[in-house]
């Protein structure tokens, strides 16, 4: 096995803690947001918002999606229809606001909503079942959500991963993506922080 690139969505240790070991063991290149260069260990390649990053046969559009952290980015492999989103968006949820503001996170989620809805979403953590309980509490009549929860439970029962998810499913079921304005998003985020 050879790991050539380490794609860093943000500087939190659970996402960048292995960078130096990957560089040492595989001579991997560390890619991250230029504004976070002092917080991402071993960074080699600096990327910025709306840049197309190329590596051999792969191309990814970089999206700056602040909210969880100020320097959070996403890698959109648009030809393959895959989005590596880190901790900005989770299946049926979104990341906590640590450095950013509710408005920044709301705007970042709106940016994601403009990506083609047949895109696969790869997030940084698996909180799907817990997130589903919160969504159901606040959107109890949503049949799409109820069906997604049944699918999640079936997958977990059979030892299958619930990820990736598709953006089209998240648009129908994820209450954070359905929030109409910053105020309603902020209320949901505050409720989720204490759920």
Residue ranges and their predicted role:
Residues 23-25, 101-102, 139-140:
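Glycine-rich, phosphate-binding/catalytic loops in enzymes
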Residues 4-61, 151-155:
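Active-site HxH/HxHxD metal-binding segment of metal-dependent hydrolases
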Residues 4, 40-136, 193:
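Catalytic core of the metallo-beta-lactamase
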Residues 110-120, 129-195:
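Accessory terminal helices/loops
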Residues 27-34, 84-86, 142-147:
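Short hydrophobic/aromatic-enriched beta-strand-loop microsegments
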Residues 19, 37, 44, 50, ...:
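Generic secondary-structure boundary/loop-capping signal
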Residues 10, 22, 87, 125, ...:
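Residue-level signal for inorganic ion chemistry
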